Amino acid sequence: FHDLYGVENEGTPSMLEDGIRAAGFSPDDVDIVLNTHLHFDHAGGDTFVDAEGRVAPSFPRARYVVQKGEFDFAHGGNERVRASYLARNFDPIAEAGLWDFVEGPAQVTEGIRVVPSPGHTPFHQSVLIESEGRTACYLADVCPTAAHVPLPWIMGYDLEPLVTLESKRGLWAQAREEDWLLVFEHDPQVAWGRLDPGSDRPTLVVE
């Protein structure tokens, strides 16, 4: 997975550590980890394999936030569902007592809250970051790239595509009304943008 997806390193807490240290912090300084869902390409940095070969939390002093339903869902389902979940990404967090489960919309800390955005998985959530009267929405896989802004454009990976459609419809209505900055996790070219308030359909204005 390290070679294919860049989400795991052996013997270090993942490549996230490099970026954290470059910003002047260490993994021990991290106190909150937000998981939009628990697919391996999103939760792969939650744990790491230490020098003794043990899987341990990457951020031992943090509380890890996810929807309770997502954690339960990750432990069941058919082969299609299970293919995207790796227990080593989340079970060691439970063993360490670090999970902070939420159910539905939740205020995580001042200026940061999560809202359900199901479809990709039944308990997927997106993150709202609020500061100085403005809002940014970290969409994650409800809309992974700018190309997925139009309502009909939905990933083939989504377990419940028609639910994704309704999640996007609701998010876009609020995003247009409140002029949200939309953040795309999987887009290699477009990091963020806003919806054109003058368009009769969801149209992105790239910033």
Range-by-range predicted roles:
Residues 11-25, 29-41, 56-116, 166-179:
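Metallo-beta-lactamase
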Residues 1, 73-75, 146-150:
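Short acidic/His/Gly/Ser-rich catalytic and metal-binding motifs that mark active-site loops
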Residues 7-18, 128-207:
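Cap/insert and terminal regions of metallo-dependent hydrolase folds
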Residues 43-54, 194-196:
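Metal-dependent catalytic neighborhoods of phosphoester/phosphodiester hydrolases
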Residues 43-47, 113-125:
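Active-site glycine- and acidic-residue-rich loops that bind
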